[in-house]
Amino acid sequence: MTNSAPEEAEPVFIEVGKDDSPRRIAVRAREGLAPGLFWLGGFNSDMKGTKALALDAWAAEHGRASVRFDYSGHGESEGKFADGTIGRWLEESVAVFEKFCSGPQVVTGSSMGGWMALLLAREIAKRPRNASLAGLVLIAPAPDFTEELMWKGFSPEIRSEIETKGVWLRPSQYGGGTPYPITRALIEEGRNHLLLGSSIEVGCPVRILQGGQDPDVPWRHAFNLAQRLPADDVVLTMIQDGDHRLSRPQDIARIIAAVAEIG
């Protein structure tokens, strides 16, 4: 694997949600061989993160197609972060996938992106599309995080603030520690997309990478997800000393190996 990244091109923009809250979504797409790589980022992250860039560089080196984008309210896309919901970001994920992907795709989702990847798989199964799933690579996946990892863990005081004011500013250990909004809409709308209460059919191989020292998504959450997936061709790798980001060189190497194993 080379350490040199391809030259970063300017993003193209597509409009999503024309009939309801239209927003312009920033996308970087490179044509190439299949299976292509489709990146789904995490909550309050963007497509210029370490893992996204490393996968894009690997795709460029191997002549593979690569697509990444920013959800509304993230990175270079339009919109306010506080307006975001799981359904809104899923709509954008499906729109980008449909417009820029063709043939089999290895969908890689980090944290919230893991939830998005599972929801995307469900949407793909509903009707024929130009692109299909070669497999999923889920990095510290956080399905149902708005309910299981946020709401259920919030104190009564925080819950009350969200319910009465509609928002709570959560302190962050990332991005310089700037607090970010957790809205009532995010929590309530997220309940429309919960997955962990039943089996999850994705119709493709799944590779899960989870850090044992992850303070944001406990390793038990990844095990719970694995138990909901079909038993065949699902591999969970526990990186005992890994944190939530899994962005160290050795972590990146494992992620790329998982992508390459699928195809």
Description of each model-found segment:
Residues 8-13, 129-239, 243-263:
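The alpha/beta-hydrolase serine catalytic core
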Residues 74-100:
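Catalytic nucleophile-loop/oxyanion-hole region of alpha/beta-hydrolase
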Residues 107-109, 139:
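Short beta-strand immediately N-terminal to the catalytic nucleophile in serine-hydrolase-like folds
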Residues 1-32, 248:
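N-terminal cap/lid segment of alpha/beta-hydrolase-fold proteins
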Residues 34-42:
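Short beta-strand element of the alpha/beta-hydrolase
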Residues 43-56, 220:
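The serine-hydrolase catalytic nucleophile loop
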Residues 54-78:
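Conserved alpha/beta-hydrolase
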Residues 109-117:
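Gly/Ala-rich beta-loop-alpha elbow adjacent to hydrolase catalytic centers
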